[in-house]
């Protein structure tokens, strides 16, 4: 019986590069939208969440392994903490949201299902927004009126995330179509 060779590494180098590039692109593009958009206005909130969610959906279509979303969240929060001074208190909430999304994808049939990345990102976006509101409530429970100001901002951001789900699927379909067209065109040149 031939011995089977087991891969010691869960993610390949290509998958880790894809994850890192998409994480950096998501953080950089949302930062640029915030700077160009002039801060926290509804248009820039929608655009930031739309771009972030689109990139996350496309990345999950590229790297279809359990745990990818959690690793993306870790890398993204690390970039946020180092570059932007992001709050460390959001890391447990984001990891819990990533765990809920990973569990939803597994319960729905696994990462190989065609709609699994969209489901995972939808659950992640919803639970991360809810958990971040929970963290905000924890810090502002002496003055709950401040939380009333935050809720509409989070809701506007989630609308952008919902739009990003559809644009992420569309971007992946367009990219897949370009790969097929490229594969058909290259043999004709040679």
What are these regions (language model features)?
Residues 44-103:
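Alpha-helical membrane segments and adjacent membrane-interface helices in multi-pass membrane proteins
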Residues 33-37, 41, 63, 67, ...:
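Membrane-interfacial segments
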Residues 2-67:
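Hydrophobic transmembrane alpha-helices
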Residues 23-31, 74-83, 121-132:
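Aromatic-anchored segments of alpha-helical transmembrane domains
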Residues 24, 30, 45, 85, ...:
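N-terminal, helix-rich and Lys/Arg-enriched segments in bacterial and organellar proteins
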Residues 28, 93-133:
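Short helix-perturbing small/polar motifs within transmembrane alpha-helices
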């Amino acid at each position: 019986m031939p011995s089977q060779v087991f891969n010691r590494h869960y993610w390949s180098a290509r998958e880790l590069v894809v994850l890192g590039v998409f994480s950096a692109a998501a953080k950089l593009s949302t930062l640029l939208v915030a700077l160009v958009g002039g801060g926290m206005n509804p248009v820039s909130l929608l655009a930031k969440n739309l771009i972030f969610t689109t990139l996350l959906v496309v990345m999950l279509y590229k790297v279809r392994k359990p745990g990818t979303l959690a690793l993306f969240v870790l890398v993204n929060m690390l970039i946020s903490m180092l570059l932007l001074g992001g709050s460390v208190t959001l890391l447990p909430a984001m990891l819990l949201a990533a765990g809920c999304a990973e569990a939803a994808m597994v319960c729905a049939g696994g990462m190989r299902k065609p709609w699994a990345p969209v489901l995972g990102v939808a659950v992640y976006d919803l639970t991360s927004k809810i958990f971040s509101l929970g963290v905000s409530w924890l810090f502002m429970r002496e003055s709950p009126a401040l939380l009333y100001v935050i809720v509409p901002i989070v809701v506007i951001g989630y609308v952008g995330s919902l739009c990003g789900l559809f644009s992420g699927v569309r971007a992946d379909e367009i990219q897949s179509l370009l790969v097929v067209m490229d594969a058909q065109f290259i043999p004709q040149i040679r």
